[in-house]
Regions:
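Short, Lys/Arg-enriched N-terminal segments with co-localized hydrophobic residues
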Residues: 1-8
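Generic detector of N-terminal low-structure segments
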Residues: 4, 20-23
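Sec-dependent N-terminal signal peptides
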Residues: 11-21
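Short S/T/G/P-rich N-terminal loop/turn motif that feeds into the first structured element of a domain
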Residues: 25-235
Length: 235
């Protein structure tokens, strides 16, 4: 489901060279959007004692700048409930030729670095868009990370991610599926939208019914998982 600078600066960008897995476990090509094949996801942690509104204003402008550099579409979410009190900035792009053109234009912008860093920590991920069923950015977003056992092959991890994605996609009506391409961790990500907490409650019941009836005895080999509820600031 997303420039930079606080007292404790901890910019983490550990690049893991890992080939982009562009097929599903059954061997068929994944149905990612032709135009939005990749998503740059950047998280910006809210520093202790900071007014989040200041960082929000800075990042909202950053995302407008990112679009002016050539990204297909950019937006911004804010932490609502979950583990990391942060902003989530996303930008979609088609391929790495476009990404290079964006870098050149961004580097030529002298104003880009003339800002004060207002966040405490930052990460970047480049994710491959495997399934794209969300047609617009939801106002309220469920963002999930799924890591599977290291003893599994890439195809086996994909098979488990597809099972979970199918369950959430049916429960929420429309979701997206992403896979690690470059960044700090090898994981799959699923995001789904909901209107409000009454709607979320209905979808909560729906996913738990599927989990109980279809996946309760499934061997999913989940190593790590996180849920975050986010609210849209700008699309």
């Amino acid at each position: 489901m997303f420039k930079k600078k606080g007292d404790i600066m901890r910019i983490i960008l550990t690049i893991l060279a890992f080939f982009a897995f562009n097929v599903n476990a059954d061997g068929h090509a994944s149905d990612e959007s032709k135009d939005n094949a990749y998503m740059l996801l950047s998280t910006y942690e809210i520093a202790p004692g900071q007014n989040p509104a200041d960082l929000e204003k800075e990042l909202a402008q950053l995302q407008l700048d990112q679009e002016s550099y050539g990204f297909n579409d950019c937006g911004l979410y804010r932490h609502w409930y979950g583990g990391q009190r942060a902003f989530y900035a996303y930008c979609f792009f088609t391929d790495f030729d476009q990404f290079e053109a964006i870098r050149i234009k961004s580097d030529a912008d002298d104003d880009r670095m003339a800002i004060t860093q207002n966040y405490s920590g930052h990460t970047d991920h480049i994710l491959h868009v495997q399934k794209a069923n969300l047609k617009e950015a939801p106002t309220n977003l469920l963002w999930m990370k799924w890591e599977f056992g290291p003893y599994l092959t890439v195809a086996e991890k994909q098979e488990r991610a597809d099972k979970l994605f199918d369950a959430f996609n049916r429960s929420f009506g429309a979701c997206n599926l992403y896979f690690h391409s470059w960044g700090p961790e090898i994981a799959h990500y699923i995001d789904c939208g909901f209107e409000n907490f009454s709607d979320f409650g209905k979808k909560h019941d729906a996913i738990n019914k599927i989990l109980a009836e279809e996946l309760a005895t499934a061997k999913l080999d989940i190593l790590d998982h996180s849920d975050d509820l986010l609210i849209l600031i700008q699309d």
